[in-house]
Amino acid sequence: MQRLRLLQDRPRVRVSIDGKDAFACILKWIGKARHMIVIQMFVWKDDPTGRMVAESLLRAADRGVMVSISKEALGDAFEWEEDFLTTKNARSGVWHQFWHHPNIEVLYGHHGDHAKVYTIDDKVLLITGMNIADEYRFDWHDILIEVRSPALVQAYLSGGGRTDSLTLVMNRDSISGIRQALRSFLQSAKQSIVLEHAYLSDPEILQILACKSHAGVRITIILPAHPDSHHYANMQSVEWLIVHSLRKNLQIFLYPKMLHSKVTLIDHWRVFLGSANLMQESLDDMGEVNLLIDRSHHRALVKINTTVRLDILKSRPVDAPPSLWWYQRILGWLRL
């Protein structure tokens, strides 16, 4: 009986790759909710994906589920004409019902919170880099982590914590845990570090990677060939790493599509992922939520390892420092 209880209490982790599977997972858990849904979101567009999620939440609210949404105002800059807040003015349809439903609460403000998190009934935690918009559902490469663990949901709601096999790390309010956790995680690598990230420019992270390469650790980096922003900053980082790393221990690849994932894989069997980007603003200033998963969650780690290997096969290697014009270096300095 004790063994059965331990198995039941052990967190269960599932990985969804890309938007089709990720949004199917999100809708599934919204559909299963019975009491409470809590959502933290950066970008939420008024497009087919945004309306699909709103409709799903409306159905949950109609069942008596309380829905609490925290929407970051800074994300509005990325919503353009599909702005979330303007849907409040809708006089009919899904958005009118959404904003006027007594069981739906929307908290909107400038808090600098970049996290994308869902909690369902204090039992399920969904952590991702995906905003609610069509490009995340249909076009961009990204990851969602589903964790069934009341203890981890409580850790999220109370500002961070851990179970025996999972560590939730956050930047929130006065808590800034992401940089220290990432620093320690990278420095613990003995054999390999694999980064699959959209944006890479933080000076300390670059320095750690170069030092680890000289210590014999194999460094593999996968970046998007055509990111939505930060391209020249990425290329300056690539140039710096090629110059300062031990070349035989450094491989850099450019993925052909836009990848938005934030995966840091250490020695194949530990991973740190979530919403945090490898740029100073994200690591230090913005609200972020990341999860550190250890080797005991074998199935999830196998899926992440397999995904990374397939992504490398789709990518082209960078064999020499990129050539950058003076104006491109200025754009890189501006983190563009």
Residue ranges: model-predicted function:
Residues 208-210:
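A structural signal for leucine-rich repeat
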Residues 61, 213-214:
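Gly/Ala-rich phosphate-binding loop of Rossmann-like dinucleotide-binding domains
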Residues 269-336:
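Long, C-terminal catalytic modules of enzymes
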Residues 3-36, 43-188, 199, 203, ...:
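HKD-type phospholipase D/PLD-like phosphodiesterase module
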